Each structure stands twice: as C-alpha cells, then as structure tokens.
Amino acid sequence: MHKYRTHNCNELQISDVRKEVKLSGWVHRRRDHGNLVFIDLRDHYGITQIVFTDQNQQLMEDASRLRYESVITVRGTIVARSNDTINDTLPTGHIEVLAGEFIVESAADTLPFVINTEKDAPEETRLKHRFLDLRREKLHNNIILRSQIISHIRHLMTGRGFTEFQTPILTASSPEGARDFLVPSRMHPGKFYALPQAPQQFKQLLMVSGFDRYFQIAPCFRDEDARADRSPGEFYQLDVEMSFVTQEDIFSTIEPVMYDLFTKFTAKKVSETPFVRIPYNESMLKYGSDKPDLRNPIIIADVTEIFRDSDFTIFRENIKKGSIVRAIPAPKAAALPRSFFDKMIEFAISEGAGGLGYIQFSETGEAKGPVAKFLSPQQLESLKATASISNGDAVFFASDKKEKAAKLAGKVRIRLGEELDLLEKDCFKFCWITDFPFYELNEDTGKIDFSHNPFSMPQGGLEALEQAKTTEELLELTAYQYDIVCNGIELSSGAIRNHKPEIMYKAFSMAGYSEEEVDKRFGGMIRAFKFGAPPHGGIAPGIDRIVMLLAEATNIREIIAFPLNQQAEDLLMNAPSYVEDKALKELSIMLSPSILKNMK
C-alpha cells in the first residue's frame, strides 16, 4: 500500500465498500459526538468523511484533539453510511472511512482565520497567509479554473495554426501608457532594463521574421495603481499577432476563441458570432462609453437641436457656447417617487456635474418635471421620438462640452441600469469597438498625443496624415484600432500595425517626436521595417479579466494565486524590501538622504 494514499478524497464510491484504503489531507472539520468523532478530510480533489469510534478509545481521543488544517494520513475501511446520514452534496457522500489508524504528518498552529467557510477575513490577513487563503473552496476553485482556461486557450490557438513563443522579460522601455518597472544593469552602470509592459515590438518583429501566426500567454508589467479589475505590477494576456491580415481577419479569428471559451466554462448565454461592431463615435453617443455594457437596454440620444431654440435658458446658452445635450431614457420610471430623481441628481453632482435635468411622461402622456415647462408640445413630441421615449418613461439630460456630456450620460446610463434593474441576466454580451481616434489631446500638456497604441496604422495612411493641417483635423483621424468588450469590461485592445517606416516617422512627428527620437526608442523595429515587413495586426485579450468574468469574481485578487495588495505590496514575501548596501554598490545605486532617513 502506498505510503500516503491509495485514493484521493473525492473518488471513493458505494462500490468501494469493504475496501481497505489510505487517505491523506487536511482536517477540514471535526465533530465530537461522545462515542464518535467525525473528521471531514480534505485534499485538492474533495472531501471524505472519516469516522473514529469508541471501539478504539485511544485513537478516538487522539482524533478529538486534532486541530483544524493539520495534515494527517488515515488508514481504514470503507463502510456505507446509514440512509439518514447520506450527504448527496458530496461525491463521496454515500460512504465514510472507518479509521483504523492515523499519522499526523504536520500539526497546524492556531489559525488566523477560518478556512472551512467563505466568511471573509480582513484582506491584509488573507494576503499575509495566502497559503491558507488558497485552501478555501471558492478561491481554490478559481485558481483551478484559471489553469483550465489557459490550457484550453493553448489548445484553441495551436488548433488554429498559431505558434507559441516566449519573448524577453528584460528589454527596453517603450511608451505603452504606464510607468515602467526598471531593472538596473550591473554590467552597464547607469543603464536600466525595463520589464515589458507588453511584448508589442517583439511580436511585430516575429512577423517581420517570417512567422505567420504568433501567440503567447504573456506576462506584462506596469507600474500603475490597483483597481477592482486591475492588479498592480503584473498581469497576463493572450498576446496574438498575424501577418497579411485585415481587421476583419483578426475579428473572425478571435471571435470563435472567445465564444468557445465562454460557452465551455459557463452555462450563461453568450453572444453569437459575429459579434456586434460599433464605431467609437457611435458608442460614445449611444452608450457614453467606449466599453458599453450591452446587457443594459438604455440608448442615449443627442437632443441638442431640440433645446437650441427652446425656452430652457441654461441649455440654450450652453449650446451657444459649444455644449451639447444628451438624453438618457429611464424606462417605466415616471411614477417613481421624488427621492429617486433627487438621488440621481446627487449622483450626477458627485460625478462633477452641476446637476441633472429630467422630465417625467405619465401614462397619459403628460410631461412633468423641472424641464418640461420650458419645451413646447412640438418639442416634447420631437424629444420622445428622438430618444425613443414612451408614456410612463422618464428622461434625464446631460449638458456640457461634448466629451464631458458623453461621459456623464454614460455614467447616468449605468446607474439607471442598476437602479431600475434593467440588465439582462445570465448572459455575456460581446461587441467590438472600432475606428478609434488616432490622436488625442494630452490633458497635462495640451499637445497632440497617441490615443492608444502608437504602432497602429492610421486610416488613410500617409495621405491622411499629410492632409491634416490643424489640431482639429488631426483629432478627427481614425486608426485601425479596436477593442473587444464584454458586459462593459474591456477585454482587449488591438490594431492593424503601421509597418511602413515613412508613415511611422510622420505619425510620430505629429506627436512631437523627431526621427532621431524614434530611431533611438524603436530602432530595432524601424530597422526591421526597412527590410521587408508584411502587413500585420494583432490583439491581446486579458487573461485575468476573462477569468474574472467566468469565475464571477468581483475583485481581480480572487483569481490570482499570489497577488499584490492595493499598495503594490506582497505581504507574504515582504516585497518590495530594502536590500543590502553591497547589492546597491554592485549596481552603482546610491539611495537619497530622505530614503536613508526613513530606513532608520
């Protein structure tokens, strides 16, 4: 018989009765009944009930003293449970093991929190004792699910003719939109490597190298703040690149992968392929966001022209100054109490707005509310037609400069969807957002900057760049840039790449980069493009966000084995930490006086 186990804790059945077995695992629960002691023994696979009787008094007493989470090996005989003790919630619930002997492999100290319930302990305690936290059923299953998802992704990608690669972790800095993690070079004092924010340049270089279909489960490193759906430090993405492809080729390749993944790992309804395509400008108008949650049926409408000549002075004067007005319908909300509308106004103010106008249309069509009296009957009918408002509905208004009004309307739409319980249940709704702006204005400098990936191909190519003479014209340029969105969560950005050096130099020059700067920062890729580069494009869906959705987790730390906390600290391994002076000297690093003072 094996030293530790003949079976795992999830496989013994009624057909195994009278077999002598050996099991090993953790003491999950212990119940003392005087002349009986029951222990639920847990391993990676499941739980089996062990019973100790007073026929072996010493063994039973020893078992009664076992602490939760101690590791034991039990030898015993399988017996059938009585009908009144059968537990159909467990695969092993029809049997139990009558213990003949047990060995304590490792005794557990007093636990800092309870393992055998899903009651949450303080996150700091959980992360400091992550090895215990990972024993809890929900988190343990999330990590298993993550492994299964990644394994299936590899199967799907190789089955579609993709080759898996590993690209360098120590590389050069690149402008991906976040701060780099820098690694000092011992051999080259004063110089630094950067951990890759994404394998962007390497995967494009592989296309130039003649490979056709690349993928990688790629670790990415960005020094950015934590969010519920973003872990500080590192994350993983399904990095994909393809040669000789159009935007639609990328879509038709990735859609079946997403559909297969989501239908395999959930019973919820999943959008049929092809997924809906929504141009960026349309998405910002209808949903007030470039990552719309299509489970929400509310569609925003532009009603600027209706208010341009209205008697509502505030909106009319705002429109004269270049503002717009967006209408956000609230289905079947007209009869709700005043407190609902006051709460929506308070929400808008908390989001930085001056307020939130609204109109209620009764079941008979009567218009009420603070804005209604300023519109003529014809304007009210036009409003109902434009915003698809029916009797019994209410409608809210957001007025500001175009971008601010769109974002406020989008937030109000989301809030209304939640407050009115409008979101379609038990489904995953996918869409593509296309035709992103190529450039944007940097909020800090007021200068032109790339809105997304600087390596995207501008629609219209070099000619479009040369014809754009003003800032306004540059901001109107669009890119072959796209996002895939599911239930309001951006899973990935992607693009058809700019593979022509002359277009790349021109695109960067518009953002204030000289040719020398471009050569210095992206010399390897520019040089490669001068030796025959295929048209290519790619995408990189986030593994962590996919797992979050499929695990129905609300926090990204619930699907990562060893995450950092919100302050980017590893409480288990005590990282980041100070290092010895010798190590700093080898790297030619000297700490500032203020840091040295804090160390003391």
UniProtKB/Swiss-Prot annotation:
ATP binds at R222, D223, E224, E490, G542, I543, D544, R545. It comes from the Bacteria. It is found in: Cytoplasm. L-aspartate binds at E176, R222, H452, R497. One of its GO terms (molecular function) is ATP binding. Its EC number is 6.1.1.23. Residues 200-203 are annotated as: Aspartate. Keywords: Aminoacyl-tRNA synthetase, ATP-binding, Cytoplasm, Ligase, Nucleotide-binding, Protein biosynthesis. It is an enzyme of class 6 (ligase). It catalyses: tRNA(Asx) + L-aspartate + ATP = L-aspartyl-tRNA(Asx) + AMP + diphosphate. The record marks H33 as: Important for tRNA non-discrimination. GO terms for cellular component: cytoplasm. GO terms for biological process: aspartyl-tRNA aminoacylation. Its main location: cytoplasm. InterPro entries: Aa-tRNA-synt_II, aa-tRNA-synth_II, aa-tRNA-synth_II/BPL/LPL, Asp-tRNA-ligase_1, Asp-tRNA-ligase_1_N, Asp/Asn-tRNA-synth_IIb, AspRS_core, GAD-like_sf. NCBIfam families: aspS_bact (TIGR00459), PRK00476.1 (NF001750). Homodimer. Belongs to the class-II aminoacyl-tRNA synthetase family. Type 1 subfamily. Aspartyl-tRNA synthetase with relaxed tRNA specificity since it is able to aspartylate not only its cognate tRNA(Asp) but also tRNA(Asn). Reaction proceeds in two steps: L-aspartate is first activated by ATP to form Asp-AMP and then transferred to the acceptor end of tRNA(Asp/Asn). This is Aspartate--tRNA(Asp/Asn) ligase. The gene is aspS.
